[in-house]
A protein has these predicted regions:
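Hydrophobic, lipid-facing positions within transmembrane beta-strands of outer-membrane proteins
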Residues: 92-98, 245, 305-311
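Periplasmic alpha-helical coiled-coil/stalk elements that build and connect Gram-negative outer-membrane
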Residues: 129-248, 356, 360-363, 380-383, ...
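Bacterial N-terminal signal peptides
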Residues: 7-18
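Transmembrane beta-strands of outer-membrane beta-barrel pores
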Residues: 76-80, 102, 287-291, 315, ...
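Transmembrane beta-strands of outer-membrane beta-barrel proteins
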Residues: 71-75, 97-99, 282-286, 312
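Acidic, low-complexity, intrinsically disordered peripheral segments
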Residues: 22-23, 80, 408-466
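A short glycine-centered flexible hinge/capping loop motif at secondary-structure junctions
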Residues: 172-176, 385-389, 426, 430
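Sec/SRP-type N-terminal targeting helices
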Residues: 46-50, 60-67, 71, 88, ...
Length: 466
């Protein structure tokens, strides 16, 4: 029975690949799962969604101008007895009234149009925020991968240097080397430990940044983050076209569409302001019950239906309407300038991300060759030292160069992935459209196109061969 239950559980897990793996007591997210979690929990996105809901309420309010309104009102008062009068002391009335707008000078139509435009604008702003959060999550995720890889590199480097120190101490005891070699090994190890501590601190900060994007609370005194991530820092070549990116950004970026809606809103607001200078006509009907104070006119209690038309027209309002229209025209001109500024800003974002991507490509090409050169230099230094033609200082310096070049290559891969994330956000495009391999796949993938950065950043097993 237990084996059957285990088999069923494995089938369910295989049928749900989108669910995060559980490492220990915390979930382990891939980068796509991290983006999905942020889309669901990020505070900025939640606030933007509430604003969208609020605009729907504004639309319902504006639409009410097309519908009849039903109101009831009543009055009761009792006056002090007056001398030389036969009027009744009590006065009361109650009415149930139905009102319907017949003509508002375009006010109701404009209010409904503005409400619809506000809904569209809020949705575009939500899309912009969601895109920005996606970019931030991708950057934070890659930063965490980078810092985790740096920790591994520094740990391996400390381990190798520690073994070298022990080796030199043993050789000193055997009388093979002098004390200077031991001191150099001690200095090299002492210099490397702060780099490890710094990498560990940066890794903790990366977890905090990603937790903030997730909207997760980190408990005071917690030694570990409430989640874990899976994958390795990888480089995937991508060569998008700048002109295509600029065209896509100008046509699809939500912030540009939101600024366009601002202009349309001000156009409708101008019609709404102008409606105050036109007549407004309302029809009404209802049923009324009221008292007659004068006994000579009729009985005290009266009731009956009422129907009529009410029209108002502000002939002169002290130029209030003119002032509102002037202010609306100024806001529209400002909205046009804001749209132009948004287009320039988006184009600048695209170009900046594109240039960063090109720079990262060049740095990666250079550092890949540099890593190979540093590896060869280390092997030569080790060979010379073993043959008695070199010094231990040459080996330590070569090992330091290898660690530094491989760490630099890790940083270049991170900058490449960051530039791709920024470019995807700037173009309002998905990762697939930009050929951005955002999914951190297995190292031994079928086509072998993804290069595992940690493999080329791993320090040598040993420094000395003697």
């Amino acid at each position: 029975m237990r084996l059957k239950f285990v088999a069923i559980s494995m089938l369910i897990a295989a049928a749900l690949p989108g669910l995060p793996k559980v490492v220990g007591a915390v979930p382990a997210y891939t980068i796509e799962q991290a983006v999905a979690v942020a889309q669901e929990r990020n505070p900025d996105i939640l606030i933007a969604r509430k604003k969208v809901v609020g605009t729907h309420g504004g639309f319902i309010e504006a639409r009410s101008g097309f519908l009849p309104s039903l109101t009831s009102s009543g009055l009761y008062d009792k006056r002090q007895t007056q001398s030389e009068t036969n009027l009744r002391q009590e006065d009361y009335n109650a009415i149930l009234r139905l009102d319907q707008n017949l003509y508002t000078g375009g006010a109701v139509t404009s209010q409904v149009a503005i409400a619809r435009l506000n809904i569209d604008k809020a949705n575009y702003e939500l899309q912009e925020i969601a895109s920005r959060v996606t970019m931030d999550v991708r950057i934070a995720f890659n930063e965490l991968l980078l810092n985790r890889a740096k920790v591994h590199v520094r740990e391996e480097s400390v381990r190798v240097l520690d073994e070298e120190l022990k080796n030199q101490q043993e050789q000193l005891s055997a009388g093979i080397v002098g004390k200077l070699n031991v001191q150099r090994a001690e200095v090299a190890l002492a210099n490397e430990r702060p780099e490890l501590f710094n990498a560990q601190t940066e890794l903790k900060n990366s977890y905090l940044r990603l937790a903030e994007l997730f909207g997760s609370d980190v408990r005071p005194g917690a030694q570990a983050a409430p989640f874990e991530i899976s994958g390795q820092l990888q480089y995937r070549p991508s060569h998008p076209d700048l002109n295509n990116c600029l065209a896509r950004a100008d046509a699809s970026r939500p912030v540009i569409k939101a600024r366009q809606k601002d202009i349309e809103i001000e156009d409708r607001q101008y019609v709404l302001d102008r409606s105050a200078s036109r007549p407004h006509v309302r029809a009404f009907s209802g049923y009324e019950a009221y008292s007659e104070r004068d006994p000579a006119v009729g009985p005290e209690f009266n009731y009956g239906g009422v129907v009529g038309i009410n029209a108002t027209w502000n002939i002169f309002d002290g130029f209030a309407t003119k002032g509102r229209m002037q202010a609306t025209r100024a806001r529209r001109e400002a909205a046009v300038e804001a749209l132009a500024a948004a287009r320039r800003s988006v184009a600048s974002e695209v170009r900046s991300a594109f240039f960063d991507l090109e720079q990262a490509e060049r740095v990666l090409e250079s550092e890949t060759k540099n890593v190979q050169t540093a590896d060869e230099a280390l092997e030569m230094a080790k060979g010379n030292f073993a043959a008695g033609l070199g010094t231990q200082l040459d080996v330590l310096q070569a090992a330091s160069d290898v660690t530094r070049t491989r760490t630099t290559r890790l940083s270049a891969i991170y900058l490449h992935n960051v530039a791709l994330a920024r470019l995807a956000h700037a173009c309002a495009s998905s990762a697939e459209v930009l050929d951005f391999g955002s999914d951190i796949k297995n190292v031994n993938n079928k086509n072998g196109s993804a290069a595992r950065a940690l493999d080329v950043a791993k320090p040598p097993e040993k420094l000395s061969q003697r």
